């Protein structure tokens, strides 16, 4: 197969997603498992989104709206961004891939912080690009070091704010200085998958920053706050030119009918999003206090997930927790072998996590 395989993917391994509950229970013959591994919404999907799905089941024999007009119109009105500066994706993951495919040629350079979302590097390497990874400083992205890594061959910079897996954020002033110093011919991808969870008012959203760099691309998702991870729907904001080039290679029906309808409805469900944010903040307080009582170190977060340092190592704790029916995330693949990552669950899920963690550590 090597002769047929693209050089860029020869050494890649598949993305390691969080283990599904069904898979764990099938493999281990257990019931009543919980999953705190994939930063999902513990409340499930927005009720208004569920109703919108039901209302659109009778048109599934028709192709989706390839332009995404109604969802893009809702986003345009909500965020005051022109329609032709918005693009929809099959999750924001597809928009990451479209960015790389549209703007990266073999041998071009890309810069990211590290550790960060694993998909950036996979997409870049698959396209034959070269990735420069800048180590985090005290679990935060150091934008000055990111700038130092930029070369004349750099085409794209990936910034994850808040950063996954650390949950740390970049402040408004940091981002403004950074965007001012990035060359105008370098695309800055600002991945804001978790921005809706941020409570720190010193953090600027990508919408505030769009006018501060000509090639800023802001990516968001309906998977986290809105609870629509299973539908795969995301969106991006940028100036007209990058959006135009991405649309040239975008699949014509990349956002399916049910995903568009559900996302459109979810944007109206402020009661659901407020409830989600309250559960996350209450859950973080409980989890922080419990971990303090256990004398375990953790990295405070601005998101719905955070890192916990475990003396036995992340992989060992992950495996022990699996046997107890609790799915978490080992951070080995992120280069943080002493850490696990969990997302906030419902109160009873958080309590079960703490109880199980105490058990496997004893």
Segments (PLM) and residue ranges:
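N-terminal "arm"/small-domain region of PLP-dependent enzymes with the aminotransferase-like
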Residues: 1-62
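Short acidic capping loops at alpha-helix termini that bridge into adjacent secondary structure
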Residues: 32, 82-86, 106-109, 153, ...
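PLP-dependent aminotransferase class I/II
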Residues: 46, 67, 215-292, 296-299
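Phosphate-binding glycine-rich loop
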Residues: 61, 66-109
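PLP-dependent aminotransferase-like
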Residues: 102-159
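Active-site pre-lysine segment of PLP-dependent enzymes
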Residues: 143-152, 165-188, 192-223
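Conserved PLP-binding catalytic core of the aspartate aminotransferase-like
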Residues: 281, 291-324
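PLP-dependent enzyme catalytic core of the Aspartate aminotransferase-like
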Residues: 320-324, 328-329, 333-362
């Amino acid at each position: 197969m090597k002769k047929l395989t693209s050089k860029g993917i020869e050494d890649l391994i598949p993305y390691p997603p969080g283990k599904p509950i069904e898979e764990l229970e099938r493999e281990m013959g257990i019931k009543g498992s919980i999953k705190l591994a994939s930063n999902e919404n513990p409340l499930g999907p927005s009720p208004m989104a569920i109703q919108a799905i039901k209302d659109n089941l009778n048109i599934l024999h028709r192709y989706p709206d390839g332009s995404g007009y109604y969802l893009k119109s809702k986003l345009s009105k909500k965020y005051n961004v022109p329609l032709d500066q918005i693009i929809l994706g099959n999750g924001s993951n597809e928009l990451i891939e479209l960015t790389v495919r549209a703007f990266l040629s073999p041998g071009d350079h890309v810069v990211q912080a590290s550790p960060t979302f694993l998909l950036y590097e996979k997409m870049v390497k698959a396209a034959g690009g070269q990735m420069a990874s800048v180590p985090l400083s005290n679990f935060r992205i150091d934008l000055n070091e990111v700038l130092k890594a930029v070369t004349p061959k750099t085409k794209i910079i990936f910034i994850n704010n808040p950063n996954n897996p650390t949950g740390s954020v970049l402040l408004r002033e940091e981002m403004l200085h950074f965007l001012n110093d990035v060359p105008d011919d370098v695309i800055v991808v600002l991945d804001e998958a978790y921005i809706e969870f941020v409570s720190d008012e010193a953090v600027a959203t990508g919408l505030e920053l769009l006018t501060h760099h000509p090639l800023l691309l802001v990516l968001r998702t309906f998977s986290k706050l809105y609870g629509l991870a299973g539908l795969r729907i995301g969106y991006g904001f940028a100036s007209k030119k990058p959006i135009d080039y991405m649309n040239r290679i975008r699949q014509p029906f990349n956002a399916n009918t049910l995903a568009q309808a559900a996302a459109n409805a979810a944007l109206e469900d402020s009661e659901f999003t407020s409830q989600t944010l309250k559960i996350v903040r209450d859950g973080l307080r409980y989890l922080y206090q419990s971990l303090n009582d256990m004398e375990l170190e953790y990295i405070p977060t601005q998101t719905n997930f955070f890192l916990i340092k475990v003396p036995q190592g992340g992989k060992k704790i992950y495996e022990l927790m699996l046997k107890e029916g609790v799915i978490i995330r080992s951070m080995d693949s992120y280069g943080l072998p002493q850490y696990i990552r969990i997302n906030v669950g419902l109160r009873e899920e958080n309590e079960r996590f703490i109880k199980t963690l105490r058990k496997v550590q004893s």
